[in-house]
Amino acid sequence: PTAIIVGTVSPEGRPSTRTVLLKGLHDGKFIFYTNYESRKGRQLAQNPYISLSFVWHELERQVHIEGTAAKVSPEESDEYFRKRPYKSRIGARISPQSQPIASRMQLIRAFVKEAARWLGKEVERPDNWGGYAVTPTRMEFWQGRPNRLHDRFLYTLKTDGKWEINRLSP
């Protein structure tokens, strides 16, 4: 399962969450890709603190992560963008993510026009689209147990780079 719930905060301190796809784990950092001009992108540009949640109801497991997000390199974003399906690349170029649009037809027309523009060519990544690497500073692992006596373990990154581990009461 690669779906993660991403939490960010507006400049006014209002939280918002949405589901994105986790695309990798590199050097201990969680990687996902998005439109930098989306609501989450704008919020991360002003406040890099982020939360990630993985929820597996069937397994009665959850992992909650807090940390900071930073853009990955343009080269890393380009590499991943080239691997995306053709229609997803076109969609990334034309979608004004999180902005109001007049109609679905407006989106479809823009898609058809952009697809014709790139016919037979390699679709380039738009500058407003790319990846984020989330460096965790706190991770909580939760395992459901009978009688609500769940297991909870909190990992907190210390200034020396080592993780402190504590069992938490359910």
Language-model region placement:
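Binding-site signature for planar aromatic cofactors or substrates
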Residues: P1-P170
